[in-house]
Amino acid sequence: MRQKLVIGNWKMHGSLAANAALLEGIKAAPARARLAVCAPFPYLAQCQALLNGSQVAWGAQDVSAEARGAFTGEVAASMLGEFGCTYALVGHSERRTYHGESDAVVAAKALRALEFGIIPVICVGETLAQREAGETEVVVGRQLQAALDALSVEQLGRVVLAYEPVWAIGTGKTASSEQAQAVHAFLRAEVRERDAGVADRMAILYGGSVKPDNAAELFSMSDIDGGLIGGASLKSEDFLAIGNA
């Protein structure tokens, strides 16, 4: 049975003082799920220091597809690896939308993360217009296929997927548990076409306005293995409640 995984995405929030209080609150209480936080780059060293020796992992919100060089503003996977980074989000809808990241770039970022022992959390999801046009499976299938084409079976076995319907991120809207389960089942079936064992073991997270009051229902679905949490990850009590859902 796959253990639940709950990853907090702080996005562009935080301060040294607020982070310290949040991290101390998270690591002080037990959770049924595995927990991790993805913090802004300037705070990764703080996460490393405060979470060292705890059961809470930490990660980055992005990683460069490039190994090194004249790429101002980029952060290399090798740099994250030196800090002991566990996870890196790749292909979050906000990166795809605001920075024009293509499926190929997302796959390249996943490959680079894996090269340095970092688990890429590959995010896929459709807009409201795409859902209403009946294109959900076409869109998320295309996004996933880029990774399937780029990764070996062994590499794929070290990946986490996250389904984040763009229309449900930060809007207060949430896909129903049945809607989310249908997409998660589709994604797992696509991975199974490549390797059944990998598909059965892979964590597929749901991200889209997950809160303490809807987490249990979402997480009860057979193919939903946890959550990628935005706003609710900024309050330790909410994040822990989701981790215990």
UniProtKB/Swiss-Prot annotation:
Where substrate binds, per the record, is at: N9, W10, K11, G170, S209, G230, G231
Name the keywords, alphabetized. Cytoplasm, Gluconeogenesis, Glycolysis, Isomerase
Name-wise, this protein is Triosephosphate isomerase
Show the GO MF annotations: triose-phosphate isomerase activity
May I ask which residue range the UniProt record assigns to the signal sequence? none
Q: Which reaction does it catalyse?
A: D-glyceraldehyde 3-phosphate = dihydroxyacetone phosphate
Pfam entry (one): TIM
Identify the domain of life.
Answer: Bacteria
Quaternary state and partners of this protein?
A: Homodimer.
What EC class is this?
Answer: isomerase
Spell out the catalytic residues: H92, E164
Q: Which InterPro entries match?
A: Aldolase_TIM (IPR013785), TIM_sf (IPR035990), TrioseP_Isoase_bac/euk (IPR022896), Triosephosphate_isomerase (IPR000652), Triosephosphate_isomerase_AS (IPR020861)
Query: A Gene Ontology biological process annotation?
Result: glyceraldehyde-3-phosphate biosynthetic process
Tell me which EC number(s) this protein carries.
5.3.1.1
